[in-house]
Amino acid sequence: RLELPAFIATLGTMMVSRGLGSIVSKTKTISFPQGTAEGAWFREIFMVTKEGGLFPKNFPTGFLLLAICAAVMAVVLNKTKTGRYILSIGSNKEATRLSGINVKKYETLAYVFSGFFAALAGIAYVAVFSTAQPNTGNGFELDAIAGVVIGGTSLSGGVGSILGTIIGVFIMTVLKIGFPYIGVQSHYQLFITGIILVFAVYMDILNRK
């Protein structure tokens, strides 16, 4: 309703949320030893930690949840009017409004979808690592942006796919996991991530010309 640019609104609410997290936790690490212990129900949602079940031990059930969510959102984005309207708003908001579509409604839905999956990712992180810190996730937004752009989503809006996003995020994850194994230190990792992001955005600009 404030008509803020989506990127600025996202960064602003991210900073507010981080600040609230620091205030509530008093900047201390919070542990969840009971809910996330081996075999506990909370952790079992995202990873099998005991023998004798449907899946083998250490099977990442969170991957199945990811696949289900991705499939559902792919259908929503490509096969429903909600998805088509969201893409249309990203492509040309004013033309979409003049077509009689409730732009604010579908913009809000896009934010709701984004917030829901960000929250789900946070829950998964806590379930797997058993702790939560106010600064957990700092820098993840750069990886997310880079992954999305690498996956073919245009920063100008209107172009993108769920499968492309998953592929882009997978590439970024492989790089982050692989860097330590080849001796790349953390500050170099951030530098390389920045280079990848700039290159991906540049390629997006070239594709739109």
How would you label these PLM feature ranges?
Residues 71-111:
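Membrane-helix/interface signature in polytopic inner-membrane proteins
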Residues 6-8, 82-85, 105, 163-164, ...:
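Residue-level recognition of membrane-helix boundary sites in multi-pass small-molecule transporters
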Residues 6-7, 58-66, 107, 139-141, ...:
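Loop-to-transmembrane alpha-helix initiation sites
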Residues 91, 98-105, 175-209:
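Cytosolic-side transmembrane-helix boundaries in multi-pass membrane proteins
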Residues 6-80, 106-109, 129-134:
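Transmembrane helix-bundle core of multi-pass membrane transporters
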Residues 14-21, 63-76, 111-122, 150-153, ...:
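Hydrophobic core segments of alpha-helical transmembrane domains in multi-pass membrane transport
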Residues 2-4, 80, 101, 160, ...:
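Membrane-helix interface residues
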